[in-house]
Curated annotation (Swiss-Prot):
GO BP annotations listed: photosynthesis
Family, similarity comment: Belongs to the PsaF family.
Protein name: Photosystem I reaction center subunit III, chloroplastic
Keywords for this protein: Chloroplast, Photosynthesis, Photosystem I, Plastid, Thylakoid, Transit peptide
SUPFAM superfamilies found in the cross-reference section: Subunit III of photosystem I reaction centre, PsaF (SSF81536)
Function statement: Probably participates in efficiency of electron transfer from plastocyanin to P700 (or cytochrome c553 in algae and cyanobacteria). This plastocyanin-docking protein contributes to the specific association of plastocyanin to PSI.
A UniProt-annotated Pfam family: PSI_PsaF
Protein location: Plastid, Chloroplast thylakoid lumen
Annotated source species: Chlamydomonas reinhardtii (Chlamydomonas smithii)
Transit peptide: 1-62
Main location: plastid
InterPro entries xref list: PSI_PsaF, PSI_PsaF_sf
Length: 227
């Protein structure tokens, strides 16, 4: 017959166990919160560092990455030497005072002058040794290359507007003729020349016509094709 004996120590430990487990859970939870806080702080610091590094690039890796002044570009100098060397090879095929030799010498001088002017103008060259233009107006202003963008842009707009305005004035002028269609097919050169000279100041003239209300055609005069 087996006898079962009660162990007081076991009973006492069983009474203490629930509070110990609660203390252990509290300690684990505190440790988890502390770890999460450290991880969050580390992630925030990493995000801040990444944002700063992206928003403030170094001068060596500017927004015009890969472009260097042509005067400092090795590829640009190499390209100049290559072109001159090609011309020199062709020059050796002709006599010194022959017409082709004189023409090639003039071409060599123009080539040297062209490369020198590009370098002096401060143009930027890529890895291919060719000058590149900055098409972004903001970057062009930032790096002092605004003329490379704005001058061609305004030049194009002026020429395009000039052609359109003078052509419009010509059509208006021949509209009152007996056969206006013939004037459109066979251009009236004296009239066209006169209007071409008058159209040089077309931006101011267009603004004045807009203020008078004569620049745009009335809606009732605009035909609509059937659909």
């Amino acid at each position: 017959m087996a006898l079962t004996m009660r162990n007081p120590a076991v009973k006492a430990s069983s009474r203490v166990a629930p509070s110990s487990r609660r203390a252990l859970r509290v300690a684990c939870q505190a440790q988890k919160n502390e770890t999460a806080s450290k991880v969050g702080t580390a992630l925030a610091a990493s995000a801040l560092a990444a944002a700063v590094s992206l928003s403030a690039p170094s001068a060596a890796m500017a927004d015009i990455a890969g472009l260097t002044p042509c005067s400092e570009s090795k590829a640009y100098a190499k390209l100049e030497k290559k072109e001159l060397k090609t011309l020199e090879k062709r020059l050796k095929q002709y006599e010194a005072d022959s017409a082709p030799a004189v023409a090639l010498k003039a071409t060599m001088e123009r080539t040297k002058a062209r490369f020198a002017n590009y370098a002096k103008a401060g143009l930027l060259c890529g890895n291919d040794g060719l000058p590149h233009l900055i098409a972004d107006p903001g970057l062009a202003l930032k790096y002092g290359h605004a003329g490379e963008v704005f001058i061609p842009t305004f030049g194009f707009l002026y020429v395009a507007g000039y052609i359109g305005y003078v052509g419009r004035q010509y059509l208006i002028a021949v509209k009152g003729e007996a056969k206006p269609t013939d004037k459109e097919i066979i251009i009236d050169v004296p009239l066209a020349t006169k209007l071409a000279w008058q159209g040089a100041g077309w931006p101011l003239a267009a603004v004045q016509e807009l203020q008078r209300g004569t620049l745009l055609e009335k809606e009732e005069n605009i035909t609509v094709s059937p659909r």
